[in-house]
């Protein structure tokens, strides 16, 4: 007898404001970034928080919490005239496996929906998402 099929991954819906807040970061420069979370009751991706335009990198790293997952769009400022838009998947290695699966599926949905992302990056440990790593990804190496 074969093993029962595991349930199919849950499809996470995007709340209407997900795209709007993304445009507020990317085009309107209203925020420097936005944190997306999944409301498990409604199974919907929602806005958890926004970053003001003058926030520093340390404020971003405070969102990388143990036992949690989230998705962040963050405008990393390289200089006064240059920035790169990062799509960040945070899935703490200590987060529940069900959350990791849920956010991994949501990551795919968001990545398809949000157009104009410069760089995608993922981490399970804070050491994988340091400012040095962001700089290396944002600034192309000179030949």
Swiss-Prot record:
Gene3D superfamilies with a match to the protein in the record: Severin
GO annotation terms (biological process): actin filament depolymerization; actin filament severing
Gene Ontology CC annotations of this record: actin cytoskeleton; cytoplasm; nuclear matrix
UniProt keyword annotation of RNA-binding present: no
UniProt keyword list: Actin-binding, Cytoplasm, Cytoskeleton, Nucleus
Recorded GO MF terms: actin filament binding
Pfam families: Cofilin_ADF
Taxonomy, superkingdom: Eukaryota
Domain ADF-H: start-end pairs: 10-139
CDD domains assigned to the protein according to its UniProt record, in alphabetical order: ADF_cofilin_like
Signal sequence extent: none
Similarity annotation: Belongs to the actin-binding proteins ADF family.
Protein name: Cofilin-2
